[in-house]
């Protein structure tokens, strides 16, 4: 495969929230945001790869002043743009700009109640703001088929039982919502901490239900939007799944550096210095590294996956990554 079909660009590590399961540790590390000239260079390098989609994530992409220029430049290059937002600050002008510039927008909401969501997302008031953002975005996008608006719910042990109530809630509040995605929290980033795995990672029974199509069918009776439920295991990148064709997106850090593997620390170079195709080939070579395959091929439980994550992050992360990992706060 000479180029990725999709790219995830964490365009900033700045974030108003402090999510307990954040894979990028946004808000706990320098933002590494680029100025417009270098943002434009990264955009042009991505367009050269001809992916179907670029996902703008973070951090909170909407804190980047040039995010809409980025989206417009990508779309003018024939690439669809998918924005992820926590919805913390969306004045009317921002809602209008999102509707104008994006192909798809997803609001992250992790519970059917403020108590649950705010605890997991690390800031009081974040549930109400996210719900308001989803309402205003769905209203603004109504009648505009070129923009899809959805909600992403990261499933943890403590919010699992709220899933049916959440389906009913969003169906009532957002009648024109396009989709809802329920994905298991993965033991990556902050969620790879031993305490988080012990207390908040989904149980084996909860994981079984997320994999059970009849469970998803039951949830579909509560809402009109399209619904997807996933164990997110494809992101683990076990060798046999790569062989089966589960090729991940290219993961780009805020300053243009490309990760070898999307959910693990470790980069292979920068789009500001080398062609994207060169970096993609270098990334794919990492997937077959015996040190990687030996850790991932036996990671069949969340606990084992978390252990593999911690080892890979320390193995391939740079000195700054290693220092940040050592300073991670204990959970709970």
Predicted ranges, named:
Residues 1, 257-332:
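Flexible mid-to-C-terminal extensions adjoining Fe-S/redox cofactors in radical SAM and related proteins
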Residues 1-97, 101-103:
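Conserved alpha-helical substructure of the radical SAM core
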Residues 7, 26, 54, 82, ...:
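Short, functionally important structural connectors and interaction interfaces within domains
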Residues 8, 108, 316-319:
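Intrinsically disordered, low-complexity peptide-like regions
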Residues 28, 143, 289-292:
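Charged, solvent-exposed alpha-helical segments that act as regulatory interaction surfaces
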Residues 45-48, 73-76, 136, 169-172, ...:
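Residues within well-ordered alpha-helical secondary structure of globular protein domains
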Residues 101-110, 115-247, 251-259, 263-274:
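Radical SAM enzyme [4Fe-4S]-AdoMet core and its adjacent flexible, acidic
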